[in-house]
Amino acid sequence: MSPGFRRAVTGQGAAAAVQLLVTLSFLSSLVKTQVTGVLDDCLCDIDSIDKFNTYKIFPKIKKLQERDYFRYYKVNLKRPCPFWAEDGHCSIKDCHVEPCPESKIPVGIKAGRSNKYSQAANSTKELDDCEQANKLGAINSTLSNESKEAFIDWARYDDSQDHFCELDDERSPAAQYVDLLLNPERYTGYKGSSAWRVWNSIYEENCFKPRSVYRPLNPLAPSRGEDDGESFYTWLEGLCLEKRVFYKLISGLHASINLHLCANYLLEETWGKPSWGPNIKEFRRRFDPVETKGEGPRRLKNLYFLYLIELRALSKVAPYFERSIVDLYTGNVEDDADTKTLLLSIFQDTKSFPMHFDEKSMFAGDKKGAKSLKEEFRLHFKNISRIMDCVGCDKCRLWGKLQTQGLGTALKILFSEKEIQNLPENSPSKGFQLTRQEIVALLNAFGRLSTSIRELQNFKALLQHRR
């Protein structure tokens, strides 16, 4: 430090210098040390995930999300909160979800569950809005009677399965089709006590945690003086692998959602036209190791852990989609083939990843205890999916429901290995099935994680540019 600089940093200048040093310290810790290295509870390093996602997964999953089979999602945003009296929905205009009018939805999508791979439709590759949806292809009427009977069996099986999340009844009058591309996940202004109540309920009541242990930075917890959260992590490390994994999945999902909000933040609005983009200040508020007392980097590591879990699920479910009987049907033969080819290409990439999480390490104890723990795990997660109906912002609720359903589908896949291995090639299996709703949620949820990791790289670059 030069003599001139020493003289300058007095009084208010000293405060400014300290702030500058804090910023540089954040950059250094984030880029070089805090979010690097090997993840806990697995043998994968963050740098390998970054490269794999950037060069193999992200470009393809982004294209897949733009395919019409994966862009339409039927969801009930009017289900009442089952846990407390919700004090109304968010009135902020950016919270609003614009559904596709029923009359605009292609016939192929409205066909319902009688043909589970024919519930999306498109014949145009560039669809600007729902107004053009009626141009899409209709259902292929050349299905054999045998296939139609098989589809009925599939629907029966779907209704009887034990899911890891609460599924919306697509036949409910309150369920609506939403074009995900027209309703992107981004910062809406939804915050405060309502948002905190949702996440507090998730963490405090559904993460195998006693009430006497408080997670760090919980604004609803009683004051703990100088406690920086180490007591929480001491407790967490003392848990079995399965319960640690559960917490990391929820924390990773929370981190991913926060990254989306920071990356697509309402920066300004002029002449009624909003401008969205990355907000570095908001990113620092949520992830800066200084501002979050070390929590930010832990959250980001949990994001990578969640990415590994869903990546593993995609690699395990590949045989299900590789069968000739599975066709992501839209009514346009050429487009159908392209969509499936792209999906299978993504599956091939997921199988090539060399450092997968080993799900066999979970629920590996005595059979009775493992079965009981697995059921508790499933019910806790299913409860979290129900909490998403308590989110006051419609757009936040939409993406919260989709991403919890996607993770729930991933967990269902990971714990159905034997059923997937025994799938028949040319006929439906009663041992394992996925609904179209689950397929759309699974791939879009993983796409959100892939985007989160890509956005994290963008924030690192922005911060480095500011040095």
UniProtKB/Swiss-Prot annotation:
Similarity-based family: Belongs to the EROs family.
First and last residue of the signal peptide: 1-33
EC number: 1.8.4.-
Disulfide bonds: C81-C390, C90-C95, C90-C130, C100-C262, C207-C240, C393-C396
Protein name: ERO1-like protein beta
Gene name linked to the record: Ero1b
Source organism superkingdom: Eukaryota
Record bears the keyword Transferase: no
Post-translational note: N-glycosylated. The Cys-90/Cys-95 and Cys-393/Cys-396 disulfide bonds constitute the redox-active center. The Cys-90/Cys-95 disulfide bond may accept electron from P4HB and funnel them to the active site disulfide Cys-393/Cys-396.
PANTHER family: ERO1-LIKE PROTEIN BETA (PTHR12613:SF2), ERO1-RELATED (PTHR12613)
One record GO biological process: cell redox homeostasis
Recorded GO CC terms: endoplasmic reticulum lumen; endoplasmic reticulum membrane; membrane
Ligand binding (FAD): R186, T188, W199, S251, H254, R286, R299
Glycosylation sites: N122, N140, N145, N383
Enzyme category, top tier: oxidoreductase
Subunit structure, as described in the record: Homodimer; disulfide-linked. Heterodimer with ERO1A; disulfide-linked. Also detected as monomer. Homodimers may be somewhat less active than monomers. The abundance of monomers and homodimers may be tissue-specific. Interacts with P4HB. Interacts with ERP44.
